[in-house]
Amino acid sequence: EEELGTELFERSPHKVKLTEEGELFLQYASQILDLVNRSEEEVRIRKEGLQGTLYIASVEGCGPHLFAHWISEFQKMHPHVQYILWNGNTDDVNNRVAKGLCEVAMITAPFNTEEFHVLEVYEEPWVAMIPEGHPLYSETNEPINPNALLPYDLLIPSRESRQGEIHGWFSDPQSMPIIRGRVAHMMNAYELSKNGVGIAIYPESISSLVRDCEVCIRQINHPDAKAFYALIWKKDRTLSHAAEAFIDFVKQNRKVN
């Protein structure tokens, strides 16, 4: 206070609080300390290599496949980085990123571009998983028109926005599909469909669970029946060096076979 020639604290018999000048000084001091810490970290990285733990969250579908590919390649460049991965639906993943429980995450559209940085990385069609013996079962797996699904029980993902998205595939707004269940995890949807509870409507990556002919996979024949995936991270939040490096890596290597 003597050096600056201004009061940084308001003092009373029972408490002390920052003045406006004190708040401003604290803000700049925090930025300076952060810069010092990051500079020390940069020097350490140059000497010892990138280290730390990368906290990741992902939806099902293509999320695990994409992350497995990226981490495998990223690890070759930065072998000392460790990983903690968490899986859930998009709403749960969004919440974890918002609360700072993970730095980088994979979700499906729609995306919250006001709160998160969004890097679109992949898309795949939606499909119908139909149990053997069902009238719509097909050994040739040809595409299916959404209206053909109207008379039958459907199982869809649990995310709130999915029901409206799926309703939009049907030509008659007065004829809505029968939603028998909303299921959070693909494996549950697969088992329910295989046992005749309903037709599972999920992104095409659910077909990776199929091991026999007890179900068939038919692509939904509609231009809007696509699932879009994106990498997200929180705006206005300082990322770890590991997270920054990983995001830069994905930007350059987002295409995955």
Locate predicted features:
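A short LG(V/I)-centered, amphipathic sequence patch enriched
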Residues: 1-18
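Alpha-helical linker/hinge and terminal dimerization helices associated
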Residues: 2-4, 25-47
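Central regulatory/effector-binding core of bacterial HTH transcription factors
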Residues: 51-114, 183
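A late-sequence structural motif
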Residues: 66, 216-257
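Alpha-to-beta junction loops
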Residues: 97-107, 126, 193-200
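Beta-alpha-beta core module
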Residues: 113-120, 124, 188-236
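Flexible hinge/capping segments at coil-to-helix
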Residues: 113-154
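Secondary-structure junction motif
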Residues: 137, 142-146, 152-174, 239-247, ...
